[in-house]
Regions:
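Extended ligand-binding regions for polar small-molecule ligands
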Residues: 34, 38-39, 79-83, 87-88, ...
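Ligand-binding clefts/hinges and TM-proximal coupling segments of bilobed small-molecule sensing domains
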Residues: 34-40, 50, 171-188, 224-226, ...
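Bilobed "Venus flytrap"/periplasmic-binding protein-like clamshell domains
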Residues: 55-64, 74-89, 122-126, 140-196, ...
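A ligand-binding cleft/hinge motif common to bilobed small-molecule-binding domains
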Residues: 105, 120-130, 175-178, 192, ...
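Extracytoplasmic small-molecule ligand-binding "clamshell" domains
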Residues: 35-118
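Periplasmic-binding protein-like
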Residues: 138-147, 210, 214-254, 273-297, ...
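Acidic, polar ligand-binding/catalytic clefts
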Residues: 83, 95-158, 227
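Short helix-initiation/N-cap motifs at beta->coil->alpha
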Residues: 41-42, 96-108, 151, 171, ...
Length: 303
């Protein structure tokens, strides 16, 4: 019974976090004017054009980037980027179907051709870049650790001997494995399950992207974020290998949206005003270019 109540509490917390992030969608982002400007850019891939709509994989449990709203619709930053792609391709924001994906399922879903692309909080890694192509970056994330208010973890090295939850297949799984070998790790397929492990005290902390954890901490008076920030690595849109026409279209439109500062417009309509300062440098803007890391994989660099 206690576990059931805790699970219900986590579901409520996720819903509250989603509601806290939810704001009015940016009306007309990437609309007719952008469509005209995009006319001379690489053409829409034939498969998408003939279908008359996009099919895009997005997260459904990751506010404020991809989640299900109270009215049962897809919402979030990634979803608004998908709608902008729809406007740029077809002149309307509703020419897109969404497929819910999780961290471990998103690349297989892309490779099996169930979707055209994935806009799903996909952090760049060299290993992933060997099996799929990345677009130019469209967001820059930072890792954080969510802990109970009464936790004795004050720095990352305090995780030694403790149990930390995160999602399977995430960059945090590999970083913990490489750099914190004395830390036990609970791996889950969804963020809600990883959060549940923290809530029912199976885990001493939940490691994940700041964008998700800030919303949780803001709605749970029993938790807080450790001050340490780590693994500041951009996200890209996932594209199948060999689809050069798709890569050309996506990259050109991301660059167009960057030049028009449309990612910041989307972000402003995704997060509450009090978080503007926190996230203002997380999106590509005319004077803010995000770059993927070079050299050793960040998840192999310990601190």
């Amino acid at each position: 019974m206690k576990k059931l109540l805790t699970a219900v509490g986590v579901a409520t917390l996720i819903a509250a976090a989603s509601a806290a992030w939810t704001l009015a969608a940016p009306a007309g982002t990437g609309g007719t004017k952008a469509e005209k400007s995009a006319h001379a850019l690489p053409p829409l891939p034939a498969t998408v054009k003939s279908r008359g709509r996009w099919v895009i994989g997005v997260k459904c449990d990751f506010p404020p980037f991809g989640y299900i709203t109270a009215s049962g619709k897809n919402g979030g930053y990634d979803v608004e980027v998908a709608k902008a792609f729809s406007r740029l391709a077809f002149g309307k924001g509703n020419r897109v179907s969404y497929v819910c994906v999780t961290t471990p399922s998103r690349i297989p879903t892309l490779q099996s051709k169930r979707v055209d692309i994935i806009i799903s909080t996909l952090t760049y890694t060299k290993a992933r870049a060997e099996v799929i192509d990345y677009s130019v970056p469209y967001y820059g994330a930072t890792g954080r650790l969510l802990i109970p208010n009464n936790s004795n973890i004050t720095k990352l090295s305090d995780m030694s001997g403790k149990t930390i939850s995160t999602t399977r297949g995430s960059i945090y799984e590999r970083w913990l494995h490489n750099c914190y070998k004395n830390t036990n790790v609970i791996l889950t397929d969804t963020t809600s399950s990883a959060l549940l492990a923290l809530q029912d005290r199976r885990a001493a902390g939940f490691m994940y992207d700041d964008a998700f954890l800030v919303g949780v901490a803001a709605n749970d008076p029993n938790t807080k974020l450790l001050a340490a920030r780590f693994l500041n690595i951009p996200w890209g849109i996932g594209i199948r290998k060999g689809e050069s026409d798709m890569r050309a279209w996506v990259n050109s439109r991301v660059k167009l949206m960057k030049a028009r500062d449309q990612f910041w417009v989307i972000m402003q309509h995704t997060i509450p005003r009090r978080f503007y300062t926190t996230f203002k440098n997380n999106v590509p803007r005319p004077r803010n270019t995000l770059k993927y890391p070079t050299g050793p994989d960040p998840e192999t660099i310990c601190r």
